[in-house]
Amino acid sequence: MLRLMPVGDSMTIGSAGEHTWRYRLWQHLRETYGGPFRIVGPREALYDKATNTSDSYEYADPDFPRAHLAGWGEGWQHMTPLIADAVRAHKPDVLLVSLGLIDLGFYTDAEQTAEQARTFIAEARLSNPRIAMALLPVIPNVRADTDPPFAAQVAHFNELLAKTAADLDEPRSPLLLTSTPSAYDVNHDTYDGTHPNASGEHKIAGAFADSLYEAWDLGERYGAGEY
């Protein structure tokens, strides 16, 4: 059985009332993947904006495997200390990783963030030397429109992430740099300039799904009808 673990920040955990891209990808794989699979991880909750806590289960559709390793305001530096134990406990075959925006926005520059990504990869491999990882480039948020230095850091980190994936890729533990979400527009695909609305959820799920299909023949391409 194929086990997938979503790892991410606020764009991955989602907040109360949302479906999340995790749900959209699960729906897609349920229809297109030919074998059994599970979504795994140590957490299940959404973020509750009313209480500023990650303890809500008010999904728009709660009837799906909600497991993940994601957190509101958490980035590479927060997930790196957790990933070895999470991989050991939940035994994912594939990590679906969307991290970096919060790091670049508040904690570390592009070079430091890329170093965290390298450490994260090493830690995951300590628990499973054959783990595969699909890495989503950072999607610039609305801040990039008015803060050129921040936009430059995002672009530089994405270049470093691509180099990291190429440098550390191994046949037994492949690293996949996914495509960027198709035609993603923060003015139309988010509800606040950062966090995905329904169309943004579909586009992030599509970026993972298309890359998993093209690189590893998992499932099928994300259909236009799913948007």
Where is each model-derived feature located?
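Loop/turn elements at helix/coil->beta-strand transitions in domains of secreted/extracellular proteins
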Residues: 1-3, 32-38, 90-96, 128-134, ...
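Conserved SGNH/GDSL esterase-like catalytic core that processes O-acyl groups on lipids
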Residues: 4-5, 11-115
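Solvent-exposed loop/turn segments at secondary-structure junctions
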Residues: 10-14, 43-49, 100-106, 138-144, ...
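Histidine-centered active-site loop/cap adjacent to the catalytic His
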Residues: 7, 189-227
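Substrate-gating cap/lid alpha-helix
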Residues: 121, 140-179, 198-202
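Stable alpha-helical elements in mature extracytoplasmic
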Residues: 17, 21, 79, 83, ...
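Sec-exported extracytoplasmic/periplasmic mature domains
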Residues: 12, 26, 30-34, 88-91, ...
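N-terminal hydrophobic signal/anchor transmembrane helix of membrane proteins
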Residues: 35, 80-89, 167-196
